[in-house]
Amino acid sequence: MDFNYILEKIKNAEIIKCPFPHLDIINFLSKEHLQLISNEKQIHFEEKTTNDEVYKELVENGWKIQGFPGCTSSWNDYKKYSSGNPVENIGITFRLHNYKNKIIKKLLEFMNSNEFHKTLKEKFKIYEETTIISAIQKNLTGYEISPHPDIRQKCLTYLLNINNNSEIENLDCNTHLLEFKDKYKYIQEYWEKNKDVNRCWVPWEWCNTIKKNE
């Protein structure tokens, strides 16, 4: 299976500089590969009526709870929060560990390959030694992550959102690309001057949304 067209899309994409250097690649996957993922029952299964039914379906299909920012690692804690009315939402993330579809498995192997890794690094002129992790994840209802930069140990993030729910476009669950409001830009300046300081999450009201990625 040839996935090299993905490399060409990365190489040919223009680097957008605002609010920070990034790529915005429309139709990143071919129609064939997108349809394959959208129709795969291991990934997109029928709607369930209870949290426990969702959990059972996920576990039986090779998904495991994944530690992730803004999320709990306890299914019982997630159920407790999602069934009540907490002051703040709490989410939970699952990662797929066993791929039933051979083509999807090959796609993930490709997106963890040296060739894919090298193409991303060359695009953004990254010369340090790095590793790559590509995976399929699900963020369940309640997931929300406050504005944040990447942790210092991470030099690049890529995100491919795939959802076959036609209502998703009407929901505010897009990725926001942000910049600090003027009165908070001193924080960014401090981070830039102090590379040994880990950066933190900040409140939404400190930032302006420059762009939404759907």
Predicted segment positions?
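Fe(II)/2-oxoglutarate
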Residues: 1-18, 185, 189
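Short, functional N-terminal and low-complexity linear motifs
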Residues: 1-7, 83-89, 124-127
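Non-heme Fe(II)/2-oxoglutarate
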Residues: 12-119
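Catalytic core of non-heme Fe(II) oxygenases with the double-stranded beta-helix
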Residues: 93-112, 116-214
